[in-house]
Amino acid sequence: MAITDVAEYAHLSDADLEALGVELDAIRRDIEGSRGEKDSAYIRRTIAFQRFLDIAARLVIAGTRGKVGWALGTTALTIAKSIENMELGHNIGHGQWDWMNDPEIHSSTWEWDMAGVSSQWRYSHNYRHHMFTNVIGVDDDLGFGVLRVTRDQKWQRSNLFQPLRNVLLALMFEWGIAAHGLHSEHERATTDAEKSAVTHALIRKMARQAGKDYVFLPALSLRRWRRTLTANVAANLLRNVWAYIVIACGHFADGAEKFTPAALEGETKPEWYLRQMLGTANFDVGPIMAFLSGNLCYQIEHHLFPDLPSNRYAEIAQRVRGVCANYDLPYTTGPLVRQYLLTFRTVSKLALPDRFLTATSDDAPETASENRFRNVDTPYVSRDGTGDRRRRGLVTAIRDRQIRRHSRKFVHAGTSAH
C-alpha cells in the first residue's frame, strides 16, 4: 500500500521535520531575494531564441527541397516547440516570472502553443497535481487516468493494454493534457453553463491549434504544402513524446513514492515539503538537455519551489542535495535512459494482476509504505544539540533492509545446497 505517515516512513522526528522545513524555507527566501536582472534577461533571451528558431525552422522546411533540409527543419521545429512548451509555457504558467510584472511574460496572460487551454491546465496542474502530488485518488496526474502505476490502483482487465496505452499517451500527449484540464474544470464547475463554457473554450483552442499547424501554415507553402504538413505533424509528435518522457521520469520512476489520502490530514508545510521530496524523481543530464526539458530534470526542486525561476534550479539542487544528506533522505535521480526504463518497467509489470508480481505491496520498487520498516530493528538516531548530524534515516533504513534481504537469500541458498 502507499505511504500514510510520511514522517514515519522518512524516519524523521517532529523536531527534525520542523528543522527540515526551516532549511527549505531559507532556500526559498534566498532565491526570492536574489531574483533580478540576470533572471529577467534569461527569460527574455529564451523567448527571443525560441521565436527565432521557430521561424528559421519553418523557412528551412519550406525553402529546401531534399530530405536533409526537411529533417533539419523538422528537428529545429521540434526543439522550438519543446522550448515553448516546457521552458516557456509550463514555467511561465507556474508564475515563475510573475515577479517581473511584465504583462507579456505572466501566468495570467501566456497562452502556450499546445492543444489545451493554459488556464484549464493551470488549475489541474498547479493546484490538483502540485498540491496533492502522487496522492492516490486526488492527484489526477498519477497515471493520467489511463495507466496503473501503483498497486494501490485496482487492477482491471483493460490494464493488460498498458504498454500500448503508454505509447499512445506519449504520441498524443498534448491532446491528453487538454482533455485532462477539461476534466478538472468539469469537476469544479457548479452549473451546466460553466461546463459548457469551458468545453467550448477548449474546442476553440483545439480548432485554432489544428488550423494553424495543419491548414494555415501548410497553405502558405503553396505547392509544398505536404512538406510543411508532414514536418508539423512530425514535430508535434516528437515534442509530445519528449514531454511525456520528461514528466513520466519525474513521477513514475522507482523511488517516486505514492501516498494515501490520509497523508493529507492535518498536513503541515514541512510535511508537504517532505511529501514532494519523496514523491518525485530527477534525471541526470547536461545543461543543454536540462534546458530542453524546461529544467524539469530537476523535478524534486520544481515540486518544492514550483514558482521559482527555472534557471535557478541547478543552483537550488546543490542545496537540496545537502538537505537530503543532512537528514539521511534519498535524493532520487539517475541517467535519463535508466529512469525511463524503470518507468517503462513499472507500466509493463503493473499491466498484470498482483498475483503475478513477486514483491509485496509495501516493499516494491514502485510502491512502498511505512509497513516495510515496522517490526524491524532499525535504530533511530535523531540529531542532538551538539551539531552532530550523523543519523540513521530513510537511506540507511533502506540500505539495511537490502542487506538483510540479501543475507537471507545467501543463507537460504547455502541451506538448500546442503
Spans of features found by a protein language model:
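Polar-ligand-bearing catalytic/cofactor-coordination segments
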Residues: 9, 24-41, 252-283, 305, ...
